[in-house]
Amino acid sequence: MQSSPDASDIEMLWTVATARILLGSEMNLQVPPNLSADNYEIYLEAGINDWGGVSPLTIDYVNPEAPWPQLADLQSRSASKGFELRPRLPIYPEFFTKSHVKKSEMLRTHIENLIDSDGYVKGGMSRYVATD
């Protein structure tokens, strides 16, 4: 893949939109925002619902040449398309809140201390981005 050309924006948008149609609204679709830094918010319109593991602390180890966007910018661009940026744990909220996975008592207690009633990180983006 290293010698393969990157997919164009049109190819990526088509792929995301097709995946959304085929996989349905319950499937989580990710597109890393750092791989199309100029216009990454367009993928929200195509059907993604997750930016993946964006980190303000680490580089993208898979694509170290592509820095993560600032969280405030990611939040602003998401909001511009009508979406609320919400931090989550590595486990998707529905897998915990709907009990799709078996959990030990210790793990369940630890996760419950970290999440809100919707299964997202308590405190939301205000834990990571200063708000006015």
Which residues does each predicted region cover?
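Auxiliary Fe-S-binding modules of radical SAM enzymes
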Residues: 1-132
